[in-house]
Regions:
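N-terminal Rossmann-like NAD(P)+-binding domain of SDR-like oxidoreductases, especially those catalyzing
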Residues: 1-185
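A conserved pocket-lining segment of Rossmann-fold NAD(P)-dependent short-chain dehydrogenase/reductase
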Residues: 97, 177-189, 199-214
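Active-site loop immediately N-terminal to the catalytic Tyr-X3-Lys motif
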Residues: 101, 189-193
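Short alpha-helix within the catalytic core of nucleotide-sugar-dependent glycosyltransferases
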Residues: 35, 197-198
Length: 214
């Protein structure tokens, strides 16, 4: 299968790439702007070839294309002949979305739209969207998928918009979309993350007091 993974140099992307490589028979094209993940992160997971935008051609092994999800022409080019798009690239976290709501909206809404459009134009049949628990907002437990969303942050709103576009592209264009609401993902290679779980692990390893606010 031919896979496109946006944000593939991040923690979840690297974990997915390792799993796919272990299965063999997969070609993987990573699109990343390298603001969080790095070439070194990808190299520690696998051997890859970096391909310039002008040299994108047929899928071949693991490739890295350095670029921005807001580049709609690049999205169409990257997704050509893909079997599935895994859209992980995003502006992550509530804090940054409050500091710069416009940047959050552009990355998480327009960036997602660009790759759904790339899927539609290139007849890519499957699209997986990395969402978050943030669209649910502040609700009383038990929490389940059928609860009406009530986002309380720009980040939650932008991820909810992405979910809405995925639903629309499934109903309108028959793209098989899947939305995954990740929450505090952790595992090997995640200690650099700013999530509460990664912070607790770092504090525990350093024999520090675990701080809980609220």
């Amino acid at each position: 299968m031919n896979w496109v993974i946006t944000g593939g140099c991040g923690f979840i992307g690297i974990s997915l790439i390792k799993a796919l490589i272990s299965e063999n028979n997969h070609n993987i094209r990573v699109l990343d702007n390298l603001t969080t993940g790095t070439r070194k992160d990808l190299l520690e997971a696998c051997k890859y070839a970096e391909v310039s935008v002008g040299d994108i051609d047929e899928f071949n092994g693991v490739e890295l294309v350095v670029g921005d999800i807001l580049d709609e022409e690049l999205a169409i080019k990257v997704a050509r002949n893909a079997d599935v798009i895994i859209h992980l690239a995003a502006n992550t976290g509530v804090g940054p979305s409050v500091e710069n709501p416009r940047a959050d909206c552009m990355a998480n809404v327009i960036g997602t739209f660009n790759y759904l459009e790339a899927a539609r134009i290139n007849n890519v049949p499957r699209f997986v969207f990395a969402s978050s628990g943030a669209p649910a907002g502040e609700v009383d437990p038990p929490i389940h998928e059928e609860l009406p969303p009530h986002p309380v942050s720009p980040y939650g709103a932008s991820k909810l918009a992405g979910e809405g576009y995925c639903s629309a592209y499934y109903k309108t264009f028959n793209i098989q979309t899947v939305m995954l609401r990740f929450g505090n993902v952790y595992g090997p290679g995640s200690l650099h993350k700013s999530s509460i779980v990664a912070k607790f692990i770092r504090q525990a390893l350093n024999k520090e007091t675990l701080e809980i606010y609220g």
